[in-house]
């Protein structure tokens, strides 16, 4: 039996670049700095650009080229109700995306058994627990990446990147015995190392999402 192409809806987590004002050059410079801090995480990653706070005319071709120079792939704009601007963005190759309140992601019924890794996760390695929690009974080196659709438990030092709730589960958490991360992320919201308050550095912590913002708590047990 011949199989045919099938078009289905799906959910993806996308980074959003919020332009705070009309100074697009400054925003692109900031983006370039962020990408330089975690190039393997941002390389060829799709990004949506929120232009809600931009009042002046936008050269969408230059904006697209500027984002591409950072190594990310601009896929769309949001925060724009002006039909003329929407048409200009479309002509430049952007999709026009409307904001919506996403439905709560419920995965518990589909979750698989926890994935357990006993060996160190070395630089350049990536471990992904699809539809599952991930337990690392060792250290995560700089340049390594651990990803889970559920929560991540690291019984060692996290020096690389930890990405929990990769499919959008905001209830996901990250636990680690010694936080020295290059990046922590839950449901698409992320902090780079310079955003992590030094009081949590080298500490036993729990990372959660509260009202769409990352929160870190020190664990005393």
From Swiss-Prot:
Return the similarity comment.
Belongs to the MinC family.
The UniProt record lists the keyword Repeat: no
Q: Which Pfam families match?
A: MinC_C (PF03775), MinC_N (PF05209)
InterPro entries given in the database record: CAP/MinC_C, MinC, MinC_C_sf, MinC_N, Septum_form_inhib_MinC_C
State what this protein does.
Answer: Cell division inhibitor that blocks the formation of polar Z ring septums. Rapidly oscillates between the poles of the cell to destabilize FtsZ filaments that have formed before they mature into polar Z rings. Prevents FtsZ polymerization.
Q: Which GO terms describe its biological process?
A: cell morphogenesis; division septum assembly; regulation of cell division; regulation of cell septum assembly
> Which protein are we looking at?
Probable septum site-determining protein MinC
Instruction: Enumerate the UniProt keywords alphabetically.
Output: Cell cycle, Cell division, Septation
Q: Which Gene3D superfamilies match?
A: 2.160.20.70, 3.30.70.260
Describe, as the record does, how this protein assembles with itself and its partners.
Interacts with MinD and FtsZ.
């Amino acid at each position: 039996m011949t199989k045919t192409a099938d078009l289905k809806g799906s959910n993806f987590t996308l980074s959003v670049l919020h332009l705070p004002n009309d100074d697009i050059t400054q925003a692109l410079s900031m983006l370039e700095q962020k990408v330089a801090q975690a190039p393997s995480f941002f390389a060829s990653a799709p990004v949506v650009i929120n232009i809600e706070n931009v009042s002046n005319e936008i050269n969408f071709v230059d904006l697209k080229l500027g984002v591409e120079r950072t190594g990310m792939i601009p896929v769309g704009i949001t925060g724009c109700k002006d039909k003329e601007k929407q048409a200009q963005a479309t002509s430049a190759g952007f999709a026009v995306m409307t904001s919506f309140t996403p439905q709560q992601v419920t995965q518990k019924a589909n979750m698989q058994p926890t994935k357990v890794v006993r060996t160190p996760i070395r630089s350049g390695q990536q471990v992904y627990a699809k539809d599952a929690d991930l337990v690392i009974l060792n250290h995560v080196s700089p340049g390594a990446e651990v990803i889970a659709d559920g929560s991540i438990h690291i019984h060692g030092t996290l020096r690389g990147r930890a990405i929990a709730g990769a499919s959008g589960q905001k209830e996901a958490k990250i636990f680690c015995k010694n936080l020295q991360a290059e990046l922590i992320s839950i449901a698409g919201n992320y902090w780079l190392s310079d955003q992590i308050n030094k009081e949590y550095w080298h500490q036993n912590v729990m990372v959660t999402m509260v009202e769409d913002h990352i929160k870190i708590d020190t664990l005393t047990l």
